[in-house]
From Swiss-Prot:
Catalyzes the reduction of the glycolytic intermediate dihydroxyacetone phosphate (DHAP) to sn-glycerol 3-phosphate (G3P), the key precursor for phospholipid synthesis. Keywords: Cytoplasm, Lipid biosynthesis, Lipid metabolism, NAD, NADP, Nucleotide-binding, Oxidoreductase, Phospholipid biosynthesis, Phospholipid metabolism. Sn-glycerol 3-phosphate binds at residues 82, 110, 165, 218, 228-230. GO terms for cellular component: cytosol. NADPH binds at residues 14, 34-35, 82, 114, 229, 255. This is Glycerol-3-phosphate dehydrogenase [NAD(P)+]. One of its GO terms (molecular function) is glycerol-3-phosphate dehydrogenase [NAD(P)+] activity. The gene is gpsA. The active site is at 165 (proton acceptor). GO terms for biological process: carbohydrate metabolic process; glycerol-3-phosphate biosynthetic process; glycerol-3-phosphate catabolic process; glycerophospholipid metabolic process; phospholipid biosynthetic process. Belongs to the NAD-dependent glycerol-3-phosphate dehydrogenase family. It catalyses: sn-glycerol 3-phosphate + NAD(+) = dihydroxyacetone phosphate + NADH + H(+); sn-glycerol 3-phosphate + NADP(+) = dihydroxyacetone phosphate + NADPH + H(+). The lineage of its organism: Bacteria, Bacillati, Cyanobacteriota, Cyanophyceae, Acaryochloridales. It is found in: Cytoplasm. PANTHER family: GLYCEROL-3-PHOSPHATE DEHYDROGENASE, GLYCEROL-3-PHOSPHATE DEHYDROGENASE [NAD(+)] 2, CHLOROPLASTIC.
Length: 310
């Protein structure tokens, strides 16, 4: 494989893990951060592939800055951010595609806990987008004996799976923090999947994508690991800590907190049923206790399971 020049925007644990994978495949990696020594212009000088691994809140400003630099249309943009923009309700890749309409824009998402990837533990992910040549290029860049990369044309579904599961991870953290048991956790995760699918398909994603790595896979990883920041938010809320206290002590961004707010706004506008996410939202706003959130879900109207699985 020929050497590819890759620029990674964001030097947090996720950006660093992706950089390590690319370097292990003998590609040239340049890392940029807001506080780093390189300017954006310097970091992008040779970039053939641009990987964006910053938090959602920084995406709009960064996109505006990059737009001034006039990227070559051959540069592949890979979004590795999970979230929704509160101002526009758009996903990260939608922002990038609107900013660079002539560039291939892809999404990389899956059950990828950064610390495990840094330790070279086996993992798999999905790179998604409509440009098959670009997708296969990025697949080759990161694939290795410890990191298996699959492709998918459903860019939006892949992206939404990784975004929406962060909200559910908060709820599962609450479940674990309250010591509700394995049965409760299994029920919560299982009922969360159709909730994610309802939102995802309403917005244009394909239902089957949510049964893959970027949907169910990421949901399982994030909802069952204390390494997940979103899980930790829910767990510590159940332990009686306040949200500001939790976020202040958290190492990194829990995207699920912002995503919950945006998701509820979106669901209200579009009339999408999201009972689990709605209780997470009420909890994050301090309107109910973790125990009250549980009671609200358990006391809902009884119904057949099949009526809303998809």
């Amino acid at each position: 494989m020929s050497t590819t020049a890759i620029t990674i925007l964001g030097t947090g644990v996720w950006g660093s893990a992706l950089g390590t994978l690319a370097q292990a495949n003998h590609h040239t990696v340049t890392a940029w951060s807001r506080r780093g020594p390189l300017t954006l212009t310097q970091s992008l000088a040779q970039a053939q592939v641009l990987v964006v691994a910053i938090s959602m809140k920084g995406i709009p400003d960064l996109a505006a800055q990059l737009q001034q630099l006039k990227l070559p249309t051959s540069t592949i943009i890979v979004s590795a951010t999970k979230g929704l923009d509160p101002a526009t309700l758009r996903t990260p890749s939608q922002i990038w595609q609107a900013t660079f309409p002539n560039n291939p824009v892809l999404v990389l998402s899956g059950p990828n806990l950064s610390k495990e990837i840094e330790q070279r533990l086996p993992a798999a992910t999905v790179v998604a987008g409509p440009n098959q040549a670009a997708v296969e290029t990025v697949q080759q860049l990161f694939s290795s004996d410890c990191f298996r990369v699959y492709t998918n044309p459903d860019q939006l579904g892949t992206e939404l799976g990784g975004t929406l599961k962060n909200v559910i991870a908060i709820s599962v953290g609450v479940c674990e923090g309250l010591k509700l048991g394995t049965n409760a956790r299994a029920a919560l995760i299982t009922r969360a999947l159709p909730e994610m699918i309802r939102v995802g398909t309403h917005l244009g994603g394909q239902a089957e994508t949510f049964f893959g790595l970027s949907g169910l896979g990421d949901l399982l990883a994030t909802c069952t690991s204390p390494l997940s920041r979103n899980y930790q938010v829910g767990y510590q809320l159940a332990q009686g800590k306040s949200l500001p206290e939790i976020l202040d002590q958290l190492h990194g961004t829990a995207e699920g907190v912002n995503t919950t707010n945006v998701l509820v706004d979106l669901a209200n506008r579009e009339g999408i049923p999201i009972p689990i996410a709605r209780q997470v939202h009420r909890l994050l706003k301090g309107r109910i206790t973790p125990q009250e959130a549980l009671e609200s879900l358990m006391d809902r109207e009884l119904k057949p399971e099949a009526c809303d699985l998809l």
